[in-house]
Design a protein with these regions (language model features):
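Cleavable N-terminal signal peptides
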Residues: 9, 21-24
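Positively charged n-region of N-terminal signal peptides that target proteins for export
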Residues: 1-4
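Aromatic-rich carbohydrate-recognition surfaces in CAZymes
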Residues: 108-136, 140-228
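Bacterial N-terminal signal peptides
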Residues: 7-16
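Short, solvent-exposed loop/turn segments at the edges of secondary structure
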Residues: 17-20, 184
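Polar helix-capping/helix-linker motif
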Residues: 13, 53, 69, 129, ...
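Feature targets compositionally biased, intrinsically disordered low-complexity regions
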Residues: 13-14, 104, 200
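Low-complexity, Ser/Thr/Pro/Gly-enriched N-terminal "stalk/linker" regions
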Residues: 25-113
């Protein structure tokens, strides 16, 4: 059976078969609409962004100027700043030190692993923007506080607010959002702190609170090495 007529018929019915002239015109029109689409940003309005960084904005402009693919440039412009635009809550803590609570996507809780990964791309820019550096320090300090509070928890609330998992069969406290122990929850804060120190040379994060958190981490790792 000759399938060629069937294929042609299907192409015609689907609108895929057209003259060279109409195809060229369609391509030009499509390219125009695509270019227009990529000129529109999906970032929140400036007044609604949770945190602003001149260094991040400068990096976006730099990378966009080097990209010839409009879609890639548009994706970078919208994706790279998304964490600071929509999830970072920076303030001064009760001790006067930097404190940053980072939402994990649309969940109003902070995962130790996820928050470390979310802000990781910005560490390279820390020396170019003091506000950004302070925000990153705040993430590290908040992670240390969380670990000291409960090294077996993987996600925390922004204060003792409780949550939907309070009835889980484990030792839940109102500050904890979720208590599902993961080894990477304790590794990612160390990774972030080390990279921050390598880039900035700021050793102020390695204070008594750091030592207490490290003791908690080591004790937890040793406990989880048990055989029974």
């Amino acid at each position: 059976m000759n399938k060629y007529p069937i294929i042609v018929s299907l192409l015609l019915s689907a609108g895929y078969w057209c003259s060279p002239v109409s195809a060229a015109e369609a391509c030009r029109a499509d390219n125009t609409s695509v270019a227009a689409r990529y000129e529109v940003t999906n970032r929140p309005p400036d007044s609604e962004r949770l945190f602003r960084s001149k260094a991040v904005d400068h990096k976006i402009a730099e990378i966009k100027s080097q990209l010839t693919n409009a879609k890639l440039a548009w994706m970078f412009e919208n994706c790279f700043p998304n964490t600071i635009d929509t999830t970072v809550h920076y303030r001064k803590g009760e001790d006067g030190k930097n404190d940053t609570f980072v939402y994990t996507g649309d969940i109003h809780a902070m995962w130790l692993r996820d928050s470390g990964a979310q802000v990781w791309p910005y560490v390279q820019l820390a020396n170019e923007d003091k506000a950004l550096k302070d925000m990153l320090e705040g993430v590290i300090r908040r992670q240390l506080k969380c670990i000291i509070l409960d090294p077996y928890a993987n996600a925390f609330n922004d204060g003792p607010t409780g949550g939907e998992w309070m009835s889980d069969m484990t030792d839940m406290i109102p500050d904890v959002h979720e208590r599902k122990w993961e080894i990477d929850s304790l590794c990612y804060p160390i990774r972030l702190a080390y990279e921050y120190w390598k880039v900035t040379g700021d050793s102020s994060i390695f204070d008594d609170e750091w030592l207490t958190a490290m003791d908690k981490i080591l004790a937890t790792f040793r406990e989880q090495q048990r055989y029974d």
